[in-house]
Amino acid sequence: MSKVLAIDTSTSRTSVAIIDGDTVVFSGFRDGATAHGPSLPALVQESLAVSEVDEGVVGMGPGPFTGLRVGIAFAQSFALARQIPVRGVCSLDAIAAQINEKDFIITVDARRKEVYWARYTDGVRVGEPAVNFPADVSGASIHADLFVDLQALVRLPGNITDPIYLRRPDAIATADRP
């Protein structure tokens, strides 16, 4: 069984864990929407003091542009340097794994008074994640203010190769401005 480094920066929480089968060898997090950059290396360093890893898994969003880039770039660089595989998983799916209902919706803060969301039936995502105003998201029980379950992130199949950005970044390159 491989030891997996799990990373998620798709919410305001920077989360890191080392999972060995069903055992959580290390788990740590730091809260703060702008803390991903300084928090992630410190958490990974702390985790590696406990155990080495054979694989990486990273939450691919949806989430804020910069937060996602920090987590994904770190996971890919770490895996490349260690010559281990890394795979990407939809972060909303790893949140949904905590809910035991027939039909439900997972929402996370997208800032700008919006939410990233996805609908689930029997724990399986129905359709693609989206971004809307909270008032526009309805039709099932809504679960908000939850964070990614890193054990679920590791258990889920991961074949996502591109970050799940649901809107363009705020910054626009000078050359691309009208």
Annotate each language-model stretch with its function.
Residues 1-24, 31-39, 81-178:
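Oxyanion-binding and handling regions
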Residues 44, 75, 92:
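Generic structural marker for isolated residues within well-ordered, non-membrane alpha-helices
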Residues 52-61, 135-143:
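Short glycine-rich phosphate-binding loop at a beta-alpha junction
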